[in-house]
Design a protein with these regions (language model features):
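Intrinsic-disorder/low-complexity, polar/charged segments
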Residues: 25-26, 137, 163, 193
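N-terminal, leucine/charged-rich tether regions that mediate assembly and partner docking
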Residues: 1-96
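Alpha-helical oligomerization segments
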Residues: 158-161, 167, 171-221
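Extended assembly-interface/linker segments at domain junctions
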Residues: 74-160
């Protein structure tokens, strides 16, 4: 059992609720129909059911289990469900007894819902999912779910423990830099003109310098851990 018995809700949600009488693309409707077998609202994690303090941003975390027809599910399906339910959601995808946890950094303000990038685990046994309830209030429980599921993807660039939103923005910045570097390297390989090649290489050095800040702190932390264990 992943979560306390007190949090159990166990309500089946007809998948048609997310596409009947709603504006939805044909591709998204097809994904709901073909990729999903059953949707269950398994748990309601609240300050009352978890016996912790309320959060400033997070009132409830809904645990939605989606049984799949295959291992593939389009993320646009999760995004649609996220936008229909005005609470924070932890998704558990199930296929043939194996599970994946999916979660997005979801911002809810003045009834406006913004769903950001999804983080997910590998396929695991249900009891092995990194979804431990950690924190003294609902905000910290939610943030810790994201950090547990995202893992190394959010461990970038600073010795200081920043807030989750800053970490996510920094991880996205790192990803974009890596993408720019990869594109530029491909362009350099194709460029024949010497002057243009020099110009592109200078640009590449600048991007690599910007990327260094994301790795220098990680290296320092590794050295510190090795030093501690050696004494």
């Amino acid at each position: 059992m992943l979560f306390p018995e007190k949090t159990e809700f166990k309500k089946r949600i007809p998948k048609q609720k997310f596409y009947t009488n709603m504006e939805i693309t044909s591709n998204l409707k097809k994904a709901f129909v073909e990729q999903i077998k059953i949707i269950y609202w398994q748990n309601k994690l609240t300050s009352t059911t978890l016996n912790i303090d309320k959060g400033k941003s997070v009132l409830e975390i809904e645990v939605i289990e989606i049984k799949l027809n295959s291992k593939n599910l389009d993320e646009m399906v999760l995004s649609k469900i996220d936008k229909c339910i005005p609470y924070h959601i932890l998704f558990l995808l199930e296929y043939e007894g194996m599970y994946q946890a999916f979660i997005s950094y979801k911002e809810i303000e003045n009834e406006k819902i913004k769903v950001n990038k999804y983080y997910h685990t590998q396929w695991l046994e249900k009891e092995d999912l990194p979804c431990k309830i950690e924190g003294l209030n609902m905000d910290s429980v939610y943030e810790n779910f994201i950090r547990q599921i995202a893992g190394a993807e959010l461990n970038v660039g600073s010795e200081e423990k920043k807030n989750l939103k800053e970490d996510i923005e920094q991880a996205e910045e790192k990803k974009q830099l890596e993408k720019q570097i990869s594109t530029l390297q491909a362009k350099i390989r194709k460029t024949k003109q010497f002057n243009r090649k020099v110009e592109l290489n200078n640009e590449l050095k600048k991007l690599k310098k910007m990327l260094e800040k994301f790795y220098s702190v990680v290296l320092i932390m590794v050295v510190c851990v090795i030093t501690i264990h050696s004494h």
